[in-house]
């Protein structure tokens, strides 16, 4: 009888410990993304049918512990028109409270995207183009888990044409 009671108590203790670990994972804050003020996003023509977009992004870890930025899956919008999908394995280590500037490069094809005709004209005319990157971000926080945050707007701003 004592053995069964001990096993039941141990099982209850382990269940509470597992529940505690899940609540610890909920304490992880998502990394923050922002356009780098002195490095505007760039669009470069890639022939007549497309362009390359480089988003200079500052990624900040708001947590009091280090983590690894694992994945970024998103959708790029140019002037509110769907322009491209992106899926990056990043592997960027961010220390507690630290930040890093990374370029996010995305290729856009005008051939398959009729909604981008106006965007193409703005690019050819070397006019600024508004962008936003929406998506999800996966992090590896070691024993605290591997949460995925989003969907959310990761970064937005205006591009310059080079």
Model regions: which residues?
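Bacterial Sec signal peptide processing site at the extreme N-terminus
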Residues: 12-36
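Edge/loop elements at the starts and ends of beta-strands within beta-rich repeat scaffolds
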Residues: 26, 46-51, 64-67, 81-83, ...
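Post-signal-peptide N-terminal segment of Sec-exported extracytoplasmic proteins
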Residues: 36-75, 139-141, 149
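Intrinsically disordered, low-complexity Pro/Gly/Ser/Thr-rich segments with frequent PxxP/GP/PP motifs
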Residues: 80-115
């Amino acid at each position: 009888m004592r053995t069964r009671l001990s096993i039941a108590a141990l099982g209850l203790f382990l269940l509470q410990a597992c529940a505690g670990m899940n609540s610890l994972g909920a304490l992880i804050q998502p990394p923050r993304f922002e356009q780098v003020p002195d490095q505007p996003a760039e669009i470069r023509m890639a022939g007549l049918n497309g362009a390359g977009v480089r988003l200079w992004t500052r990624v900040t870890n708001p947590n009091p512990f280090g983590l690894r930025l694992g994945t970024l899956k998103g959708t790029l919008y140019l002037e509110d028109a769907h322009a491209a999908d992106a899926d990056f394995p990043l592997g960027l280590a961010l220390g507690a409270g630290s930040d890093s500037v990374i370029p996010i490069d995305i290729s856009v094809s005008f051939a398959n995207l009729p909604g981008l005709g106006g965007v193409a004209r703005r690019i050819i005319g070397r006019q600024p183009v508004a962008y936003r990157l929406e998506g999800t971000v996966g992090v590896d926080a070691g024993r605290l888990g591997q949460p995925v945050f989003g969907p959310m707007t990761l970064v937005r701003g205006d591009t310059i044409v080079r």
